[in-house]
Curated annotation (Swiss-Prot):
Stretches for region Metalloprotease domain: 46-199
Naturally occurring in which organism (per UniProt): Homo sapiens
Broad enzyme group: hydrolase
Gene of this entry: CLCA1
Principal localisation: secreted
UniProt domain VWFA: residue ranges: 306-475
Modification after translation (UniProt): Glycosylated. The 125-kDa product is autoproteolytically processed by the metalloprotease domain and yields to two cell-surface-associated subunits, a 90-kDa protein and a group of 37- to 41-kDa proteins. The cleavage is necessary for calcium-activated chloride channel (CaCC) activation activity.
UniProt-recorded name of the protein: Calcium-activated chloride channel regulator 1
Tissue distribution: Highly expressed in small intestine and colon namely in intestinal basal crypt epithelia and goblet cells, and appendix. Weakly expressed in uterus, testis and kidney. Expressed in the airways epithelium of both asthmatic and healthy patients. Expressed in the bronchial epithelium, especially in mucus-producing goblet cells. Expressed in normal turbinate mucosa and nasal polyp. Expressed in.
Effect of residue 168 to A: Abolishes proteolytic cleavage
Recorded consequence of changing residue 167 to A: Abolishes proteolytic cleavage
Glycoprotein is among the record's keywords: yes
Result of changing residue 156 to A: Abolishes proteolytic cleavage
Site description Cleavage, residues in chain: 694-695
Gene Ontology BP terms: calcium ion transport; cellular response to hypoxia; monoatomic ion transmembrane transport; proteolysis
Length: 914
């Protein structure tokens, strides 16, 4: 264990301007506060785990200080303890800290034995990651040999999370050619090691030097670059943080720009330190002159859920059927969404507040009915939001502190006094979820959600979009086991004319089925309702509430797996259908869809990105059909197909995260986001977690000229997909965002084509270069670009920095295809020298019809390798009769094999022989 001394790690936070983040982290005088480490409810109780987390973080603060030139340190952290663990005197109730906004999740390994620390990164270079994942065994120090000290590995992950930097190693392609010479992928290039391969046969193993492949110019499969235990290089933390000497990130001076790794691929060849230096945190801090204190810790234990509904019943709620819709959505929340064991109260407000019901615990259906009957029946008066909030605080404090409680605030009106209670809200420790109903809801409403970490949603007056019910359906608990949460399977609406039918199907898959509820609403008269289960049996027993204009059916036990069919008939009116359920089994993770946007405010012409993360437990669901419905305050709805293709807005292919740019703004104000996901004949579940941004697995190290091998890294097959069909249906609220600076129609074209991020190149036929990429659009990843500009150079930096001066390829015959189509282009390099050992670099720029240009693409690379001539062996006397070998020579370039290198972002080498 020579290279692994007791070390510490860096915790540095990159707060993106305008970015949507649930994180509670704040930077205060060089110290980071409010970081949440959550222990998963399924982790067995182990009090030593808490101390191990503390030790890791305490070590980290010093390393943070050193690595950033005394600029940052780790000030405090909250450790979130499961409700199922024993209570202790020093465990207190959380305030705003929840599992949903945790920065670090400590959970059992998936699959078992895979303890690799990793970070979810959905965005591009410089964009904040989602969450760090660690296992109890990793934190306990049981993986020191494989990943080095826990603190150092955690720094590596935190840089992914807060700064949006990427790995500087490459598990798929560990070596590359540079000017005809083999180089190990590393940063900095001064790190030393030996290229060896471990061979095992018959229970015994031995080590030998890697064999040079005279055809490809690279080493054989299985070759490892094993590091010397003693190094002098100080960088880089994103390559090999476990090495004692490494205490820095790569800078522009020592960064290895040619290495085919994700950092170069995603960040346009920039060093990690350059990316970090561009962060807002770095720009607003200066180095410290004194030693900071050790970090402090708070131990927070999840308790019973406490919720108070604060509902607007002012005069404006009488218009547009709003009060009735509030009752429908409120009943869904009370009858289905809120979990058993929760404490729920209700306050209404107009010009003043009115307590409808004190806190009661939901232990039975009768408790739910009691609250549902207290929903407001009449609307009148003005709007005083602060009165409602203050009354809710009073209701909660009669039984519990407000810390960690939740308030669901719905309003449709303006209130210019809302800022008067902001300080009280901050001091309360309560989480406020806001629902803005209609076009005139108070503009300051979202501030309440932002300052408390609550959800912000918007529902228009377009009843058929079912926005209000979706908003309340999204308010399941942010804590506790996922098996207890309400999951929305369907949400649909339609305006019928002349006794038309609203027909459709809902899939109940094997991961859900408990507490399944069918909810139907109407605007005029009760419709005819027909429902059949998968066996064709007609279902009856709907509870009809003519006053609220809704009917619902709770399926007893576990609903049958399969396709449920419904038919609704009515005269001219609007109907909606909502179906919710829960996990069928506490030990079988349900398929979930989590949707969001990359920011909650968007200033035109800045594009917005919509994400949908589809998982069963930790396993991603691939090849689903995913669409986002984005509705503006004008009532206009845009439908986006979200893709998991690794192009455009989508950062990584086949990781279960579906993404797309939104550019179709039509007005200023609020927009709601809703995602529909369907799994059919093509959908599949990946057995293992896809390769994420994670710390380097150490194959071994060299100590006193001897190689000490670690056990082989757990195999993670990127193609390990279960081909059994995954049929399911889900809907998910993606919250809302607010757009500004949108010009009046006609809206000008200010959006360029999207950046090409998956350009690959290979030599074809000895003299031609074949390019492939995913087509961008006229506006990012929508429409069709007008033309492409392709340039080449023998210098990677010249092509990046002097693209317009580099040699241009004739693309007259290249007509762009529609966005997200595969493009193929074959050309012959001209007016450039291409000889043995030469690397040729290629990049593309897309141009739209108004001459707006995309960013330069990733840089692809082809390398020409001519194997050395091998003299014929002199035959031994007893081999004189041996026949001569039959030699085949490439007909295009005699005596030369061509090495074709397809390099995605100079990152993912794929080698083949022409």
């Amino acid at each position: 264990m020579g290279p692994f001394k007791s070390s510490v790690f860096i915790l540095i936070l990159h707060l993106l301007e305008g970015a949507l983040s649930n994180s509670l982290i704040q930077l205060n005088n060089n110290g980071y506060e409010g970081i949440v480490v959550a222990i998963d409810p399924n982790v067995p109780e182990d009090e030593t785990l808490i101390q191990q987390i503390k030790d890791m973080v305490t070590q980290a603060s010093l390393y943070l200080l050193e690595a950033t030139g005394k600029r940052f340190y780790f000030k405090n952290v909250a450790i979130l303890i499961p409700e199922t663990w024993k209570t202790k005197a020093d465990y207190v109730r959380p305030k705003l800290e929840t599992y949903k906004n945790a920065d670090v999740l400590v959970a059992e390994s998936t699959p078992p034995g895979n303890d690799e620390p990793y970070t979810e990164q959905m965005g591009n270079c410089g964009e904040k990651g989602e969450r760090i994942h660690l296992t109890p065994d990793f934190i306990a120090g049981k993986k020191l040999a494989e990943y080095g000290p826990q603190g150092r590995a955690f720094v590596h992950e935190w840089a992914h999370l807060r700064w949006g930097v990427f790995d500087e190693y490459n598990n798929d392609e560990k070596f590359y050619l540079s000017n005809g010479r083999i180089q190990a992928v590393r940063c900095s290039a001064g790190i030393t090691g030996t290229n060896v391969v471990k061979k095992c046969q018959g229970g015994s193993c031995y080590t030998k030097r890697c064999t040079f492949n005279k055809v490809t110019g690279l080493y054989e499969k299985g070759c490892e670059f094993v590091l010397q235990s003693r190094q002098t290089e100080k960088a880089s933390i994103m390559f090999a943080q476990h090495v004692d000497s490494i205490v820095e990130f790569c800078t522009e001076q020592n960064h290895n720009k040619e290495a085919p790794n994700k950092q170069n691929q995603k960040c346009n060849l920039r060093s990690t330190w350059e990316v970090i230096r561009d962060s807002e945190d770095f720009k607003k801090t200066t180095p410290m002159t004194t030693q900071p204190p050790n970090p402090t810790f708070s131990l927070l234990q999840i308790g019973q859920r406490i919720v108070c509904l604060v509902l607007d019943k002012s005069g404006s709620m009488a218009t547009g059927n709003r009060l009735n819709r509030l009752n429908q959505a409120g009943q869904l929340f009370l009858l289905q969404t809120v979990e058993l064991g929760s404490w729920v109260g209700m306050v209404t407000f107009d010009s003043a507040a009115h307590v409808q019901n004190e806190l009661i615990q939901i232990n039975s259906g009768s408790d739910r009915d009691t609250l549902a009957k207290r929903l407001p029946a009449a609307a009148s008066g003005g709007t005083s939001i602060c009165s409602g909030l203050r009354s809710a605080f009073t209701v909660i404090r009669k039984k519990y502190p407000t810390d960690g409680s939740e308030i669901v605030l719905l309003t449709d009106g303006e209130d210019n006094t809302i800022s008067g209670c902001f300080n009280e809200v901050k001091q309360s420790g309560a989480i406020i979820h806001t629902v803005a109903l209609g076009p005139s809801a108070a503009q300051e409403l979202e501030e309440l959600s932002k300052m408390t970490g609550g959800l912000q949603t918007y529902a228009s007056d377009q009843v058929q979009n079912n926005g209000l019910i979706d908003a309340f359906g999204a308010l399941s608990s942010g804590n506790g086991a996922v098996s207890q949460r309400s999951i929305q399977l369907e949400s649909k609406g339609l305006t019928l004319q002349n006794s038309q039918w609203m027909n459709g199907t809902v899939i109940v898959d094997s991961t859900v089925g408990k507490d399944t509820l069918f909810l139907i609403t109407w605007t005029m008269q009760p419709p005819q309702i027909l429902l059949w289960d998968p066996s064709g049996q007609k279902q009856g027993g709907f509870v009809v509430d003519k006053n609220t204009k809704m009917a619902y059916l709770q399926i007893p036990g576990i609903a049958k797996v399969g396709t449920w069919k419904y038919s609704l008939q009515a005269s001219s009116q609007t109907l909606t259908l909502t179906v919710t359920s829960r996990a069928s089994n506490a030990t079988l993770p349900p398929i979930t869809v989590t949707s969001k946007t990359n920011k909650d405010t968007s200033k035109f012409p800045s594009p917005l990105v919509v994400y949908a993360n589809i998982r069963q437990g930790a396993s991603p669901i691939l090849r689903a059909s995913v669409t986002a419905l984005i509705e503006s305050v004008n009532g206009k709805t845009v439908t986006l197909e979200l893709l998991d293709n690794g192009a455009g807005a989508d950062a990584t292919k086949d990781d279960g995260v579906y993404s797309r740019y939104f550019t179709t703004y039509d007005t200023n104000g609020r927009y709601s986001v809703k995602v529909r996901a369907l799994g059919g004949v093509n959908a599949a579940r990946r057995r293992v977690i896809p390769q994420q941004s994670g710390a380097l697995y150490i194959p071994g190290w060299i100590e006193n000229d001897e190689i000490q091998w670690n056990p082989p890294r757990p195999e993670i097959n990127k193609d390990d997909v279960q081909h059994k069909q995954v049929c399911f249906s889900r809907t998910s609220s993606g919250g809302s965002f607010v757009a500004s600076d949108v010009p009046n129609a006609p809206i000008p074209d200010l959006f360029p084509p999207g950046q090409i991020t998956d350009l690959k190149a290979e030599i074809h036929g000895g003299s031609l270069i074949n390019l492939t990429w995913t087509a961008p659009g006229d506006d990012y990843d929508h429409g069709t670009a007008h033309k492409y500009i392709i340039r080449i150079s023998t210098s990677i930096l010249d092509l990046r920095d002097k693209f317009n001066e580099s040699l241009q390829v004739n693309t007259t015959a290249l007509i762009p295809k529609e966005a997200n189509s595969e493009e193929v282009f074959l050309f012959k390099p001209e007016n450039i020298t291409f000889e043995n050992g030469t690397d040729l670099f290629i990049a593309i720029q897309a141009v739209d019809k108004v001459d707006l240009k995309s960013e330069i693409s990733n840089i692809a690379r082809v390398s020409l390798f001519i194997p050395p001539q091998t003299p014929p062996e002199t035959p031994s006397p007893d081999e004189t009769s041996a026949p001569c070998p039959n030699i085949h020579i490439n007909s295009t370039i005699p005596g030369i094999h061509i090495l074709k290198i397809m390099w995605k972002w100079i990152g993912e080498l794929q080698l083949s022989i022409a």
